[in-house]
Structures are given as structure tokens and as C-alpha cells.
Amino acid sequence: MLYGKENRDEAEFLEPIFGSESEQVDLPKYKLAQQSIEPRVAYQLVQDEMLDEGNARLNLATFCQTYMEPEAVKLMSQTLEKNAIDKSEYPRTTEIENRCVNMIADLWNASEKEKFMGTSTIGSSEACMLGGMAMKFSWRKRAEKLGLDINAKKPNLVISSGYQVCWEKFCVYWDIEMREVPMDREHMSINLEKVMDYVDEYTIGVVGIMGITYTGRYDDIKALDNLIEEYNKQTDYKVYIHVDAASGGLYAPFVEPELEWDFRLKNVISINTSGHKYGLVYPGVGWVLWRDKKYLPEELIFKVSYLGGELPTMAINFSHSASQLIGQYYNFVRYGFDGYKAIHERTHKVAMYLAEEIEKTGMFEIMNDGAQLPIVCYKLKENSNRGWNLYDLADRLLMKGWQVPAYPLPKNLENEIIQRLVIRADFGMNMAFNYVQDMQEAIDALNKAHILFHQEPENKTYGFTH
């Protein structure tokens, strides 16, 4: 049979690429569309909007978990509609939250002689807010009892300049003076020689960080506890420690169980962590615990109806899905202590390997080698003979899909530009091999390229939001 040319214009108009004329309508962007469209078309249109987004697995900027097992995802998808705040309607979900709090308290060595308290949150930012509020209210009670004029000065919070931004928000929201202990090259975590200089009778508490966002290093919480203990012996205006363990809280107990940073220390009264970081759950879930209920002021606790009675709650957020709680409990049941330990130790090995390979290039100074948290940080050596900087390297790596942040360190070190690799449980050794190869190719390309490089007079942050 012979075929001739046909006019396809009309046929193409009547046969949209998704088999539906509704696809021909512009995708609503800033105003709600007038008409409905087919669900499969809506799905495809929205999915297409995200085609050029980065691959989360290759995002080495984020601490957040980017992979969970299909069984976990199935459980979580089956509980998306459950509102975790509805305690009486979903008593088993409430019990699961309670079990998670108890398991975490055990990991953090809560004493059987004390009555610990804890709650879930939607992340460590909310958990830090709760921990901070408890410190402020407790300080106010102690100060009033001792006759201190609480209106004479603004209360203050002492913390390393490597703090996570939620602490700045806390201080702004609740009118607290943030006293930052500066970092320097010799003190890449809280400076124990200077920290007590920032403490006075108006200090609501000192925050120790288990995993500084910029570098991944731990503050020496035990040494800080010793300093606080000596201070408290000499004054009636007691000061206590809140540990921001957003990253390290569900990592250190498995990898360094002998490290004393938790409720084993006398002056550590509260701790927060993120379940969606090294707790291995998708965002967002966090946890905050107090070593004893006396450190959690009653006025911060509210009562909700529960099985004909009342249940205490203190979360800032109200309605939120129970799915992340279910995901956390699944992981605790699935992995157990040994499973978490094995996963985190493998992640630790990957981080150490990457630090070694990056150092072998001879171009970088390792700022953090992943010996504690599996975070690798490095800067260009000052004497390295090159015409490019870390922002250029970040651009080049992005061409391969790798999202690697480059940013300045906090004040007092703001001229130090570093890159940071956050190694997560889903970043295996094979991916590490690929990264090393792609990084070397990127360096070779930059060394040979004849292009205009970044020459900004001011430092900037590239792909990094802490």
C-alpha cells in the first residue's frame, strides 16, 4: 500500500500528549484554576514541574534522611491521615510515641531514680524552642525566689558561635540575649577557656552542641559540665546545660557509647535530637527530653483529653501527621541497637575514606575528618596554586548532580571558606568511589579551564542552609 502526506495539525490538536484535552490548559501557578482536570494529568503536570530538581540522594548539604525501606514507607503512607495530636482517637499511636520516648531516654542514660519527661516534635527546631522555654521559665522561678530583679536586665543564653539558626530564632522570639562564644582555629567547638566568662546571674542556661552544623564537631559536654559544677558551687544562681544533639543524639550512643555527654552528667537537664537525621526517618520528627519533671515548668504543660482522662502535652505545633512517629518506631523495631550501630559504623567508615582521599589530592586542608559525626569539611590550602575557589568547585560538582555546599565559617572565622560533605546512611562506599572520581575530574577541568572564575569581594553561602 502506498502512503501520502497527511495534514496532521488537526490530529495533533485532538491528541494531547497525556491523552486528555485538559493537558492543554496552562498549569495553574499563582491563581486557582476555574476547572478541574483528570487526576492522572494533574499528577503528571506536577511531576513534570519537578523534573529539573536536584537528586536528594546526591544532596550532600542536608543532614536529613533521604532513604527509608519500602516497608517503612508503606507503614507511613498508611498513617498519613492520622493526626498525632488526637490522643483519644488514636491511643495506639500515643503509646508508640511513649515507647519511642522511653527508648531514647534509655539510650541517653536517664536515671531510674529520676522521672524523665519527653515528647515528640516536628523537628529539632521545635525541640530546641521547648528546651529553651523550659530553661527560661525555670530561671525566672529561681531568680524570683532569690530576689533578683528579673526586669533589670534581659536574660541571656550562652552558646557557641557555631549554633544552629533555631537558637537565634528562639532568642528573638522570647526576647533573650544570645551570648555567642566565638570559635577560632584552635577552638572549633565551644571554647572552654572562655565560656564561663559569658555566664552570670541572668543566664538561663548554656547550650552544648553535639554536632556543630558548620563542621560536625562535638562540644566537650563533660568538660563543660565540670565547669558548670564548679560555678554552681560558688553561687546561688544555678546554671544548667541543654544539649542540642540534633545530629549526634541518635548517632553517638551507637558509635561512641562510652562518650559522656548525656544524662550521665549531673548538670545536663535536657536534650533534643532529630529523628530525621541519624534516627533514619524522613523529615520531620524530633525529640526533646528532660532528665526529671522538676526541670519542666508546670505552666508549659497543657492537658488534652485522652481515653476519658487527661494527658499532658507541651508541643508548640498542634496538628501533624502521625506517620513520622510510626516511621521512627519502625526503625527502632527493625534495627535495634546492633542494627543502628552497624549502619552508623559503616557511614563512619565512608566519611573517613572520603577525608583520606580528599587529603591525598594535596590541595585541601581537612577541617573535620568524620572522626565523630560522619561529616567531612575541608578548605583549599592557602599555598595551593590555582585560579579557582570552592564556589567554582561546587558549580562543577553540580554538573555531575552533586550538591556540595561551600560557605564561610561563623564570625571570627568568616574569612575561612569551607566545603562540607554530610555522609548519611544511604551514602555507601560505591557512591563514595563515584564522588571521589567526579571530584577529581572537576578539579582537573577547573585547572585546565580558561573561564572567568568567581571573584566576589564578599563571601557567600552556596547550597548551605543550617
UniProtKB/Swiss-Prot annotation:
Biological process, per Gene Ontology: glutamate catabolic process
Function recorded in the entry: Converts internalized glutamate to GABA and increases the internal pH. Involved in glutamate-dependent acid resistance.
Entry-linked Gene3D superfamilies: 3.90.1150.160, 4.10.280.50, Type I PLP-dependent aspartate aminotransferase-like (Major domain)
Record has Lyase as a keyword: yes
Family membership: Belongs to the group II decarboxylase family.
Modified residues (N6-(pyridoxal phosphate)lysine): K277
Keywords carried by this UniProt record: Decarboxylase, Lyase, Pyridoxal phosphate
GO MF: aromatic-L-amino-acid decarboxylase activity; glutamate decarboxylase activity; pyridoxal phosphate binding
Cofactor: pyridoxal 5'-phosphate
E.C. code: 4.1.1.15
Classification via InterPro entries: Glutamate_decarboxylase, PyrdxlP-dep_de-COase, PyrdxlP-dep_Trfase, PyrdxlP-dep_Trfase_major
One Pfam family hit: Pyridoxal_deC
Lyase found in the keyword field: yes
Gene Ontology CC: cytosol
Catalytic activity: L-glutamate + H(+) = 4-aminobutanoate + CO2
Inducing stimuli: Expression is highest at onset of stationary phase in presence of NaCl and glutamate, and at low pH. Chloride-dependent expression is activated by GadR.
Name the record gives this protein: Glutamate decarboxylase
